[in-house]
Every structure is written in C-alpha cells, then in structure tokens.
Amino acid sequence: MRILRGSPALSEFRVNKLLTACREQQLPVTGIYAEFMHFADLKAELNPQELEKLEKLLTYGPTIQEHEPQGLLLLVTPRPGTISPWSSKATDIAHNCGLHGIKRLERGTAYYVEAETALTAAQIATLEALLHDRMMEVVFAELTDAQQLFSVAEPAPMSQVDVLAGGRRALEEANVSLGLALAEDEIDYLVESFTKLGRNPNDIELMMFAQANSEHCRHKIFNADWTIDGVKQDKSLFKMIKNTFEQTPDYVLSAYKDNAAVMTGSTVGRFFPDPESRQYTYHHEDAHILMKVETHNHPTAISPWPGASTGSGGEIRDEGATGIGGKPKAGLVGFTTSNLRIPGFEQPWESDFGKPSRIVNALDIMLEGPLGGAAFNNEFGRPNLLGYFRTYEEKVTSHAGEEVRGYHKPIMIAGGMGNIRAEHIQKKEIPVGAKLIVLGGPAMNIGLGGGAASSMASGQSAEDLDFASVQRENPEMERRCQEVIDRCWQLGDKNPIAFIHDVGAGGISNALPELVNDGDRGGKFQLRNVPNDEPGMSPLEIWCNESQERYVLAVAAEDMPLFDAICQRERAPYAVVGEATEERHLTLEDSHFANTPIDMPMDILLGKPPKMHREASTLKVSSPALERSGIELNEAVDRVLRLPAVAEKTFLITIGDRSVTGLVARDQMVGPWQVPVANCAVTAASFDSYHGEAMSMGERTPVALLDFGASARLAVGEAITNIAATDIGELKRIKLSANWMSPAGHPGEDAGLYEAVKAVGEELCPALGITIPVGKDSMSMKTKWQENGEQKEVTSPLSLIITAFARVEDIRKTVTPQLRTDLGETSLILIDLGNGQNRLGATALAQVYKQLGDKPADVDNAAQLKGFFDAVQTLVRNDKLVAYHDKGDGGLLVTLAEMAFAGHCGIKANIETLGDDALAALFNEELGAVVQVKNDELNAVLATLAAHGLEACAHVIGEVEASDRLLITCGEEVLIERSRTELRTIWAEMTHKMQALRDNSACADQEFAAKQDNRDPGLNAKLTYDVQADVAAPYIAKGVRPKMAILREQGVNSHVEMAAAFDRAGFDAVDVHMSDILTGQTVLDAYQGLVACGGFSYGDVLGAGEGWAKSILFNAQAREQFEQFFQRKDTFSLGVCNGCQMLSNLRDLIPGAELWPRFVRNESDRFEARFSLVEVQKSPSLFFSEMAGSRMPIAVSHGEGRVEVRDAQHLAAIEQSGTVAIRFVDNFGQPTQAYPSNPNGSPNAITGLTTQDGRVTIMMPHPERVFRTVANSWHPDNWGENGAWMRMFQNARKYFG
C-alpha cells in the first residue's frame, strides 16, 4: 500500500462549523485541520513516471492553504471490507489513464485535532461521532491502519434453524435474532412447510421469505379482510382503491401490476439517437406518461441523507423498470417531520416532547435529508420540480386522555413521472433458458432487512438492526444503468429486455424470485456470480442486502451479444446470475461452499401465506372549538407566516437541479423575483411541441385528528386545485397516486384508515371520475422509547399524500400566482368552495396557538369541485386569467400574501362579503382559489363561473396596486395594513435560518438581505439583437449540416438537450461516448464541432470535470485525438458546466486557452440551481457574435463553478486578454460578487471564457436548457418559440457558412 497526501478537505467556514459543534458538546478543542489521504493498493511498485501521473491525478479541488499537521490524528475511512463509490470511480479513472499497476484507490480524511487539554477516551468517542458516519465509516488512530481497507475476508458460511428438532420455538428465536418481523400465522406456515419438505430451513431462506412477505412488500393490511364495529366489510382497502379504476378506466394503460402506472400521453417527436448511426433525430410517436410515488420513512429517520437519497434513487429505478424500459423525467420530494425547534428561533407552538437516541431529530432530518434527495436527482440528471414540507408535533385529546401526535418517524416522499413507448408498456414472456441478469453496482453489506425493518414501528427492532437497514447511494452508477435501459428501449421492437424489475426492499432475494414468478417461471441461480464488493459476506448477506443502483432483467440467450455491447459502451457492470427454468422452483447454488443455500418450490415463497384479518373499532374524540381570546390578528399573521408548512422553502429548492433535460416548463420559482410559490410542476413532452405533463400534490394530514374522511377528501381536492390552472381538459385526464401512512393498530386508527380509503375510493374519486392507478402504504407510523424508566410514544396522524398527474394540451397556457401591475386595471376574485363555512379546525392558525379546534374544512360537494375545475379550465384555455393561486395552508391571508410576493406589488382587499368573522375568513383552509382578471374581462369571467354553478361562492375581493403594502379591510374597518417587504421578510426567516445552519452563513445572510430590497427590479432581458431572427436560416436552407460530436462521459446528463439545440441550429448532432474514443471506435477527424456536456462525470470524483480531463491527458491515444482536433482551424468547441470544467483542465492542449482558470467549489459550499442574470461581454467567441451587451437570464446548476485564479496578476491578465465571454450581473445590470446574483462567488463575476481566436468557448451556465422560450422559468411576453440563447447555436452554424 502506498499513502499519498491530498489537498485540505475542509473550507474555513466548514472548520468553524465543526469547532462550534465541538463547543456545543463541551469538548476542549481549539483547532482542527483536515486533509484528504489517498491509499493505493498496488499489484507492483510504480515507476517514477507512473508515480508522477498518480500524484497529478490525486491533485484536485480548490486551493486551500495547507498546514503541517499537528495534534491528535483521527483518520476517517470507509469501513474495511467495503469499496466506496469514490474508490470504484477513482480506480476506473486510474485505469483509463493507463495506471494498470493499481489494484484499487481509496480515500480517507485525516483530522488533526488540537485541544487545551488531552482528550479523554469519552471525549474522543464524542468527537469521533461528529467526524464520521458510523454506518459506512470507521476511525483509525494511525495512517498505516488503512492497510485494513485492502484486506480480504474469508466468506462466512450460512447457518440453519433447527425446526425439525426445535419446532416452533426455534423459529420464534430466529424471528427475533434476524429481525424478520414474521407474524404468528407466518411462523406456523413456515414450520409446516419445512416439516413437509423434511428438512431445516437455512437462514437465507427465512430472510428471503420475510422480505418477500413483509408488510412493506406484500401490503397485507391493504389486502386484509376487515370487520369494523362487529360488522364484516365486503371490500379490502385495495379493492376500494381499485374501484376508482373500475369506475373510470379512461386513459389508464397500466395499473396495479408494475413498478409504476402508465397513462395516455401525447403524440410528439421524441428526440434520441438512431441506434445504428447514433445521429440524434426526432421519432414521431406516442410518449405515454408513467407515474410513481414512493416513501422512504424508516431509513430517513435513522440516517437522513442516505435515507432520502436512496428513496429518490429507488423511485427513479421504478420508473426505468416499468414495462420493458421507461425513461424517468421529472421528480418530486416531500417531508413531514415533528417540530424543527431551530436553535435561537424556537417558535411559541414548538414544545419538546423528547425522542429516542437512535433516530435523528426533525431539524437534522431537514438539514440533511433534502440534500440527499436533491443530490441523487441532480447527479442522476432528473429535475426536481415539486414538493411539500410540513411539521406537526402536539399533545391532543384522545379517547384515553392526552397523547402526543407527530412525526418522529418522518414521512419522506419521493416520486416522479416519465415517458414510455406504447409497445414497451407490457412486459414480455420470459423464454425458458433466458439469462437472468443483475445490472448495476456490486453487493455490499448494507440495507439488510430494510423491508422488514420499515414494516415495524420505530423502536421495535434492535438499534444495530435499524442501522443495518439503511442503504447507501451511488447515483452516477444508476445513470449508467439508465443509459443502458435507454439504448434498449430506443431499439423499439428489437429491445433485448424481456422482463425487468428494480432491486429494492429485500435486495435480489426479493427481486429475482419476483422476476421469474411474474414471468411464470422458476430460476436456477449461482450465488458466486453476484458481483460482490465484500467477500466476507455470508450467503444471506450476499442474497438479501439492499445495495442500491441495481436492476434484475431477463434477456433471451440470443440477445445477449447485443445487450453486452450496450453495457460495455456505457461502462455499466452486469452479471449473468442464473437461467429461467420451466419448473416453478427456486435453486441457489454456492460454488464456494459446494452447497445449495436455497432449494424450494416457488409456491412456498410466494404462494398463499395466510391472509390477514383486521378487527377494528371506531373511536370518535370530541375536540373543543378554537379558543380565540388570546389571538391578536397581526400576531397571528406573523406566526402563520413562520409555520414551516406556510413559510418560504427556498432552502429546499435551490439545492435541486430544476432545468436538466431542457424540458422543464414550470418549476417552483415564479416570476422575475423567483419566488417559490408555483401551484404545480409542468414539463414539455418534447422539444418540437407544446404538449406536456403536469404534476401537483395535496395533503392535509393534521385534519385526520378530527375527521379521517375529511383529511383524505381535502388531499384529493387540494391536488386538483393545485393543478387546475394548467391546460388539461377534462377532469378524468387526472390520475392520482395515493400514499397512505398510518400507525396501524393504534386505538381508532384502523377504523379511521378504512373510513379514509372508503371516502376516496368508493365516494369522492368515482364521483369526480378520477382514477388512482398507483400508490404505496406505510403502516408503522409510530415511535416508541423508554426515557428515565417511562414508556413514551409519538404517534403520527393518518397521513394521505396525494400526487396528481395529467397530460397537458398546451404548456404555454399555465397560469402562475404572479400578480401583474403592467396590464391595466385588474381585480381579484376569491372562489370559496367552503361556501362561507370558514371552518378553523386543524388549520395553521390552530397549530401556531397549540390548538386543534373542532370542525375542519371538507369537500362537501364533489359536483361543485368538478364545476370549479371545469370553469378554471375554460378560463385558462381562453387566456382569461392573469394569475391563479389555490387556497391552502394559512388560508386566504397567505394566498394573497404569496401572490403579492411573486408580483412584488401591493394588494387592497375588502372581505366584507365573506361573513362577519374576519379571523375565520382570513385563516380558514377551505378549498378554493384567488384569481387575478383584467377589469374589462371581469363580467365574462364571473359569467363563466356562474355557468359552472359557482356564482354564490365567487367574491370580488380587491385589486392589485404598484405599492409595498398589503391592506385588508372589512367594510370601513382596517384589519391589516402591513408592508409587503416586512411580511416577505418574516415569511423568509425560516429558510434563512436553515440555510445559515447548513451552508455558508455569509451567503445565507446576503440572500436574506437581498429579499428585503424593495427596489429590486427583478429579472429582465435587454437584447442587442432580434430574438425572432434566425441568422442560421440561410445556411440551413443550403441543406449542408456540419457534423457535431455531442460528447459525454459516464455520469454526464445534459447531452440530449445539447443535441436538440445544435440540431435545431442546422447541425447533424451525433452521440459520442468517451468509451468510443478510448476504444478507437470513433475518431474526432470526422467532426467539425465538439461539445462537452454537463453533468457529473465520474460523480465528480477527483474534482468536477478533472477526472474526465485526466482520462484524456494521461491516455496517449485520447490526448492525441483531442490535441489534433483543437489544432485544426476548421473546428470549434464548446464546454458547458461539467464540460466547461473538463475543457478548462485541457488548457494545455487548446491554443489560446493558456490563461483559463480552474473551476472549484461554490462559495456557498452548496450545489446551486438558479435562474441567473448574465451579460454577454465583447469577446472573440464565435458563439457570441453580435450579442455583446445583451443581458438575459440563464439556467445555472452546479456545485463547483467558482473561478479560481492563481493570483491578482492572473486575474488581470485574463481581463486584459479580452477572453471573458459572460459575467453574472445583478437585476440592475451591474457585475456583482453578491450572492445569489453571483451564485458561485467567482471573482469579477466571470462565468464564461473563450480562446484568443474565439473557436473554443467554455461556460458554467446552461444555454442548451433554455433555448426554447417555454423552458425559461421567466421570460418577457414577446419572445416567440426560440428563447434568447438559441442565437448562440445559430451563430455556430453561421460560422461554418
């Protein structure tokens, strides 16, 4: 083993955060210095040239002042016996650079700790807990201890459970020790089954059975028979859900039988490379819509980042594994937790009811979990466009006195939508002899028993089992697997995939049997063929672990050469682990121990284990009405605006890429001031049409504490009012995912669950004509623990989270909450579907005064809700609405405030027609919406509402004004007169506090200050050219299309939209993978243009873009090709984002690029996804010809975009050379260092450069994602089909003549 020191690992502000954490733990630590340590496991000693190459390879990241280490060494490394994702990617890069003497690279972090006094063993243990993640890392005291990273353990054997001699008792003991969560009748079933087979079960067989038959996988409660209050019910919960499909099967193409549901989409030109020529082209066909929403609650409670990350990853795999290959497109995440209690910002309603030590508190869940979910989506390359966040934790009256209801076991929702070809919706037959394949990453000893663990209430399984059941993420691997799936479905009827499932709960022990069972086959498997990064694992651990980023497939033997070629090109690992058999029998052979760990008929595993029967009793609790004597109106406004369910959530949004794919038409951020208040998410179905897809969410979980049915109905209703202002058409076009969370078995909750499912499945949805073709349930929403000898528990309310999905006819019609003051006189109309009842039970108002109230809002009239949707659709289609915002948490007051924030304007409202109870009128959460309409169309709008039966509930309540005030009166009485800026500041406090705790606090402070600037003119565009003119048109007309290499490396994710932009500009865009160049299949001589695309090549291991660049620089064949290409005078090149970082590292090969800087970690120390204003500079860049002086917004999505120069002279030389191509500017048009206008902190606001001759340009922002006007988060009204950035690509075509 060779040890190589790396660069410092922590920025100054990260060190300060760590020192603060030490102080909070009363540790006498005075200083911490951390640096990366690299460990190389060698086949043979490296020669001097190889060593120099390796040292260069391991020099990456921002330049931070190095120290000579001193103090106590704590070396944090991955767990011995595991191979980290960093290791596998860094080793790949080393091999691609020709360093074949390296067996493996691994990385650790060496912390050198100085203290006032020598640390005790207990203090060191406390410090270690701050420095490492005990689930995947260890702490060593010496650098040489890292040798253990490369030691190979001997495989552990399996064990048996002696049922034949020990009977039921032996299995009961195994049930506890292995954490199987088997029910009593399942234990009986297994004892009987193995007694009949005349042999003892192996531990691996029991774990496999437990996973496959866990509540998590089998949904026993939803399939159970029910007796309620002594009356036998004639339908199961699942049957009531399926009733929605029986009543309204319209537009549903697949339901209840696959990894995701499928609905009818649009006929459009799908843009992807031709499988033969690899040239990108449009394929006119149906792009049907797939949809899925998952939960990952248990792992997120234990370890929030990996819990939420693998939750998103698993849901993405569900979409990819639909039919025989789907394409994930856009994602959502949601969180419900107990109270945040932000230090120094604790709110009056936030009591502390304690928690068990093994789960994370709500604050840490929300500081870490969202980053995990965002990071996976970002690296995979899926925009995250939707979400919600609610907190609830309160003592409420129950049938047995008082109890604490809340979310110590959080809800973590991960969902999304994608597209699928018509001929791929149904899975094919699995031929006998078909190869059974595991595609993706290796097995690791993580996530053991996840399915069974998440089926238990938190606290029922031993703490080490809880930690064993959390998985680890590697999104770049999942991206590679999806590229394989994409190449397969793009082959159309030649798609080699016969059957595919994702690997989720229970690992391959669940996925492989499910695969062959669903194909009506058996399987013969070889355990030692399973790719395995931990040789010491037992057969149970290899078979049942939940290592992520894996799929199982059946591929006919004759299709294997094609499948193999695809995997080789995409560098996606796979292994043939078995063959499909005619006989429905499961055999697993272990060549190492020469035995058969599994040998059982399929029917024992997946036959008919005993069906559950639930007995339930209805328990209704009366709750007192809201006590209002202590409520002052203006204080109520402030409290409600600070409640997390209401407050601004920017800290959850800008961490997630919202522009990747170039198909995003509506993200969370609305208008020129980018305020996060969008009602729903909208995507374009293709680059060549205005058809699209929309998704929205609805949830009102606290209402279930008063009325189970009302809570469920409101969730459906809110999802509808959120999505209503997109151009959908008829209501039955909307399809729902229903995610049910319940503390099953808690007194009254089972009957409540039945009531809620019946309310939606048997009553409301059939009445609306809406189908629920997909969903998920989590039935163990309770946390129990002992504290000072006292038994404590926190129980979640019944929680239904609804996600609505719909096809969109015209994405340009979507109406946002942004109020406009530049369209003449306008009025505001409230459409009140509560019909003046103004019920205050379980509202935000009640919560912030630590109350529940009595009567909640409800959907009393399904026909009226349908009339509302139809009316809004008519108004949207006829362009009658200026702005639209649904009424939700916080009521009318919050709806009006958020519309004013989005429009940066004032509101004058009079609520006298809403009854004589102003508090109830302003804070009730009955369904409805506020719309802004032009006064000359007011009567027509009111007539449309009346025609749909809404005359009595439509109230003209006010007008919009160009001011900084929110004025609400009741007749002559002034109720509220506040500065909009002041309210906007209160609304932003939570997001500021969370950002300051999590990110660079100086950046958080700057952003908070910027929101308080009432003079801010917002985003704007000032162009020096005609956006409608196409300067490439004359050259396109000649019929000559120059060839453009759309270059990607593993982990790149922005290549398709890049190809679409160049295709539109008149180029033949060709898909070129780095593996094509390294294997000599492609030569760059054939191309006139080259573009290096954005994403996360090698998962940003060895620095963003640096690993990709070094695999070129240190590979003789690749280096020669690129060098020759750059030397040719008839070529041009572009690098965007990751491609910009990569090309900047090739500066030695590019003429005129000598002064280019490096691009390193953002100032905020966070991935930044913004819609930022830039100005084009005067430069030689051919891309920006005649664009100098233009100012317009552009998509920014990166974690490492800060320009780093050697010194002030280097920066001055760059400026003097005239090669700066674009700069960030503030909304006043001035180059800026201020965050977030300058989202990465680059000096002189530089974010794009070119060469002296202008033929090569690099830039961090993404013009390819916003080349269409509809893909811009905000744009001027007068732009046509092409957005301002299309000119860049047209200029490139013009350059070739």
Swiss-Prot record:
A GO molecular function held by the record: phosphoribosylformylglycinamidine synthase activity
Subcellular location per the Swiss-Prot or TrEMBL entry: Cytoplasm
Sites where the protein binds Mg(2+): E718, N722, D886
InterPro entries assigned to the protein according to its UniProt record, in alphabetical order: Class_I_gatase-like (IPR029062), FGAR-AT_N (IPR040707), FGAR-AT_PurM_N-like (IPR055181), PurL_large (IPR010073), PurL_linker (IPR041609), PurM-like_C_dom (IPR010918), PurM-like_C_sf (IPR036676), PurM-like_N_sf (IPR036921)
Cross-referenced Gene3D superfamilies: 3.40.50.880, Phosphoribosylformylglycinamidine synthase, linker domain (1.10.8.750), PurM-like C-terminal domain (3.90.650.10), PurM-like, N-terminal domain (3.30.1330.10)
Chief site of localization: cytoplasm
Keyword terms, alphabetized: ATP-binding, Cytoplasm, Glutamine amidotransferase, Ligase, Magnesium, Metal-binding, Nucleotide-binding, Purine biosynthesis
Disulfide bond annotation, renumbered to this chain: none
SUPFAM superfamilies given in the database record: Class I glutamine amidotransferase-like, FGAM synthase PurL, linker domain, PurM C-terminal domain-like, PurM N-terminal domain-like, PurS-like
Enzyme superclass (EC): ligase
Binding-site residues for ATP, renumbered to this chain: G307, A308, S309, T310, G311, S312, G313, G314, E315, I316, R317, D318, A678
GO CC annotations on file: cytoplasm
Active site (catalytic residues): C1137, H1262, E1264
EC number of this enzyme: 6.3.5.3
Pathway involvement of the protein, from the record: Purine metabolism; IMP biosynthesis via de novo pathway; 5-amino-1-(5-phospho-D-ribosyl)imidazole from N(2)-formyl-N(1)-(5-phospho-D-ribosyl)glycinamide: step 1/2
Pfam annotation, one family: AIRS_C
Catalytic activity: N(2)-formyl-N(1)-(5-phospho-beta-D-ribosyl)glycinamide + L-glutamine + ATP + H2O = 2-formamido-N(1)-(5-O-phospho-beta-D-ribosyl)acetamidine + L-glutamate + ADP + phosphate + H(+)
Glutamine amidotransferase type-1 domain span: 1044-1297
Gene Ontology process terms (BP): 'de novo' IMP biosynthetic process; purine nucleotide biosynthetic process
Family indicated by similarity: In the N-terminal section; belongs to the FGAMS family.
Quaternary assembly: Monomer.
Functional description taken from the UniProt entry: Phosphoribosylformylglycinamidine synthase involved in the purines biosynthetic pathway. Catalyzes the ATP-dependent conversion of formylglycinamide ribonucleotide (FGAR) and glutamine to yield formylglycinamidine ribonucleotide (FGAM) and glutamate.
Name of the molecule in the record: Phosphoribosylformylglycinamidine synthase
Organism: Vibrio cholerae serotype O1 (strain ATCC 39315 / El Tor Inaba N16961)
Gene: purL
